[in-house]
Amino acid sequence: MTTIKTTVILFFALVINMAAAPAFAIQLDLMPGTQTVAPADTASLDIVISGLGAGSAPSLSSYDLEITYDDALLTPTLVNIGDPGLGDQLDLFGLGSIVSVTPGVGLLSISELSLDLPSDLDLLQADNFILASLTFTTLGVGNAAVGFGNVILGDSFGLPLAADVNGATIAIRNPVNGVPEPMTWALLLPGLAWLRGRRFRV
C-alpha cells in the first residue's frame, strides 16, 4: 500500500511540475518580412530565432536550414554567420564552430554546429538573436518569395527542437521614373564550403 501511495504522489508531483514549467514557443523568421527593391539591386534578410530560454534551457547548439528562393528573380551573393550586435551565439568564446554553406538552384543550405559546452550555452546564450544574414542580387521584376525548406534544430545536448517558421517576400519593382531595366547578372555559385570564417560569398 505504501508503494502505491508513493507512486501516486510522485505521479502528481510530476504533473504539477510539468504544468508549472515554462512553455517555449521557438520561432524562426526571415526579417524583414517584406521589402521593395529595384532590379539589379541587393536585398538583405536576417534569419532570426526567438523563444529560447533566457539564462536557461532550451538553448541552440546546432541548426541545419534550407532557405528556398525564386531563382528566376534572386541569386544569393553573401552569407554572414552570427548576430552583428551579439556575435555568433553558437560560438560564445570565439573558439570556432563548424559551419557549412551550400548553394544550389533555388536552395541555400546553411548549417552550424557549436563546440561550446551545453552548460555555457544554456547559461550565456541570448534568448533571441540572428543566426545569419543573407544578401541577394535581384534579377528581374516581380514578387520573390524566400522561405524555409527542411529545418533541423538541436538544443544544447543535440536533442531536437521544434519551431514555427515564417518566410519573407522581396518585391522587385522598376524605378518610378521609368529608367530602363539594367542588364541582369548571371553569377556562378561555388560548391560546398566547410569554413570557420563568418562571411561566405555564394
Could you tell me what each predicted segment is?
Residues M1-I9:
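Bacterial N-terminal signal peptides that target proteins for export
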Residues A23-M31:
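Cleaved targeting-peptide boundary
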Residues G33, A38-F93:
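Low-complexity, serine/threonine/proline/glycine-rich extracellular segments that form mucin-like
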Residues L159-R173:
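Terminal edge beta-strands and adjacent linker/stalk segments
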